[in-house]
């Protein structure tokens, strides 16, 4: 078990399922991180596509479907989020630029792993995020792709050992 100093404990975010009233903050975190790290390398079409996918109402619609959204909350403020689509695809993982480098993204990733329902977890990583996903155990799966202006690298990794296992009687 990892031991944290008292200062680190105060800085560790609370990870919890997203609620409808979190959606504007989730959208804000995603757009801020995207605009800083990803948007400069994309076309106007890619930026517009991401803007529509990361809009508050779009998150609301996905929250009602078979998507799980977890947030990292620090001092009563959403500072990160992860979205798992259909129990098998990591759709988004973003941390507020002001809070990056504190392990929040890794904590969100670790929190979502037990929720994966398939033996393999996939992600379409923005090119700047590929090194992070490699550290998280993903491997490249094919060539760089593009969809509606968003450039990505398909990646895969084995999910948690219990993923895809029979959940037993209900």
How would you label these PLM feature ranges?
Residues 67-80, 85:
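Conserved beta-hairpin
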Residues 106, 127-151:
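Conserved active-site alpha-helix within GNAT-family acetyltransferase domains
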Residues 1-21, 161-170:
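Conserved N-terminal entry element of GNAT/NAT acetyltransferase domains
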Residues 97, 101-114:
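Conserved acetyl-CoA-binding loop-helix of GNAT-fold acetyltransferases
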Residues 55-71, 89:
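A short helix-loop-beta-strand connector motif used in the catalytic cores of GNAT acetyltransferases and
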Residues 85-97:
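Conserved acetyl-CoA binding element of GNAT-fold acetyltransferases
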Residues 31-58:
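Conserved GNAT-fold acetyl-CoA-binding loop/helix
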Residues 115-128:
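Conserved GNAT acetyl-CoA-binding A-motif
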